[in-house]
Design a protein with these regions (language model features):
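A structural signal for multi-pass alpha-helical bundles of membrane permease subunits
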Residues: 13-295
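Short, Lys/Arg-rich, polar N-terminal cytosolic tail immediately upstream
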Residues: 1-12
């Protein structure tokens, strides 16, 4: 009898917990589901100049195939994604190793190493606009001090993508470093003791032990950064707005301009849903890779 009463009490407590959490869960689901469903619906609509909308079927998606700006935006998005991700993973691992081995480094210095990613992207973009100013910026001043010619970093079609990638890498490499540092601190010390007894050099230890054991952590960092990099918007909009011309016009910037400058909401929704599919594809690919390298 007592067991039955205890079971009934537990069931009642579970029902009470479910009832109390239901409004918050419903609100969260609605806040996520409504924009997604509404955007999908908009992707099948077309809007006239007077604001009248009508069902367009797959017209917005078929337009993507012949849209030169879409393919250019896709290329720019992939170029920025690959360049930024490689820079952030390479230098993030290096910075994590520095912080891991420099245990006597003062706390204030460690904080300075990781401070950039705590800065709002808009502030970071404005700061780099000043630094890279062709007339008064510190970057060209340093180049000229070494006898090198100045460069118009953000106005050059050749340099704008590497420059934006460097700005984003400056901000988010410390974030990758913190993730990798957590992975380093969780590695079993016994394997390093065995390597030291065997006389392995630091490079061999990193190559044969540290890097293989860190691969799942590095892939996790790649997943987190991939989602942001494929949706890259804020720093580009602050520094170049997709220019010069369309040299840094990513899919996100292009979709924003189509929707809010040309007011083609249906086509902009189709662009954003296509970008969302690309993001999901990248995440799934990296998840498979993480499963393959897990230990």
């Amino acid at each position: 009898m007592s067991d039955t009463a205890a079971t009934l009490t537990q069931d009642r407590q579970k029902l009470e917990m479910a009832a109390l959490s239901a409004p918050a869960v419903a609100f969260t689901v609605a806040m996520i589901a409504f924009p997604v469903v509404y955007t999908i619906w908009l992707g099948f609509q077309t809007f006239s100049s007077t604001g009248k909308q009508s069902f367009a079927g797959l017209a917005n998606y078929s337009k993507l195939i012949s849209d030169v700006e879409f393919w250019h935006g896709l290329w720019v998005t992939i170029a920025l994604f690959v360049l930024s991700l490689v820079l952030q993973l390479v230098f993030g691992v290096w910075l994590a190793l520095v912080l891991f081995h420099a245990k006597r480094l003062p706390g204030i210095v460690r904080s300075l190493f990781i401070s950039p990613f705590m800065m709002p992207p808009v502030v970071a973009g404005m700061m780099w606009l000043v630094i890279l100013d062709p007339s008064l910026g510190a970057a060209n001043y340093i180049l000229q001090a070494f006898g090198l010619p100045p460069s118009d970093w953000l106005a050059s079609p050749t340099w704008v993508i590497p420059t934006v990638a460097l700005i984003d890498s400056w901000q988010w490499t410390p974030y990758v470093a913190l993730i990798v540092l957590g992975g380093l601190q969780s590695l079993p010390p016994s394997v390093y003791e065995a390597a030291q007894i065997d006389g392995a050099s630091p490079f061999k230890t990193f190559q044969r032990i540290t890097l293989p054991l860190l691969l799942p952590t590095i892939v996790t960092a790649a997943i987190l950064r991939s989602v942001d990099l494929l949706r890259f918007f804020d720093i580009i909009y602050i520094t170049t707005q997709g220019g010069p011309g369309n040299a840094s016009n990513t899919l996100n910037i292009y979709g924003f301009r189509v929707g809010f400058e040309f007011f083609d909401i249906g086509y902009a929704s189709a662009l954003m849903l296509t970008l969302t599919a690309i993001v999901f594809g990248a995440v799934l690919a990296f998840n498979r890779l993480r499963g393959a390298v897990a230990w």
